[in-house]
Amino acid sequence: MGLKLKSSVRAKLIYALAPIAFLATLAFAPAGLSFEAPAGPSPAAALQQLLDGNARYTADKATHPDSRPSDAAQHPAAVILSCSDSRVPPEILFDQGVGSLFVVRDAGNTYDQLALESIEYAVGHLGTSLIIVIGHDQCGAVTAAVGEYPKPTASPMLKNIYPAIASTRGKPGDPVSNAISENAILTAARLAKDPHLAPKVASGQLRIVAARYNLASGALTILTAK
């Protein structure tokens, strides 16, 4: 006997699988193929939205907007690439609500191919015009990488942070703190060279920002912006 799905169930399945289908298309798309994405806020407007939210958060005046669950189509103002550290929750530190941020997190706020495809999906399919790479004080991944550098036997995650350590070796200040900022800067610069993202950066449709989060104050400091 054939399996029949109610129209509501079928619609939910189609909605849930759409992002997966897009990522598969993106992975095998010919070079130069572009995708039409809905228009969202400009890079400057999106960045200001998040900086205003962080100012509310640090002033203990968070409004917690749009905190209820939603099944509406998503139109995030920004992609956040941040560390998995539990003390760095993007929606809270930016005082944003459900649907406001497209968040990709891993230890050390670097990325691999799978994370990159998620970022490309947000920019190419959802129309997101801003990417913020967030490093933070006391990052355990960077601390571990500094301790392991330059051992070739370190994990791939730690090796991803090695370029930041190499770039800051011998500079004044704390080696770990220096590497934390440099790691965010280099990750943002690497994203800006991605074949799917670089044309949008060049045209001004996309801005990629490196930032650092202060665990004690809750404040975000912009390091660089492409």
Each language-model region and where it sits:
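Short acidic/polar active-site loop segments enriched in Thr and Asp
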Residues: S129
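Short helix-loop-beta junction
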Residues: F94-V103
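Conserved functional hotspot residues or short segments at active or partner-binding sites
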Residues: V133
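Bacterial N-terminal signal peptides
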Residues: A16-A29
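Short, glycine/acidic-enriched capping/hinge loops at junctions between secondary-structure elements
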Residues: P89-F94, A115
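Divalent-metal-activated hydrolytic enzyme cores
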Residues: P30-Q74, V98-G99, G108-L126, T143-K226
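N-terminal secretory signal peptides that target proteins for export/translocation
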Residues: M1-A11
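Short glycine-enriched loops at secondary-structure junctions
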Residues: S82-R87, A107-T110, H136
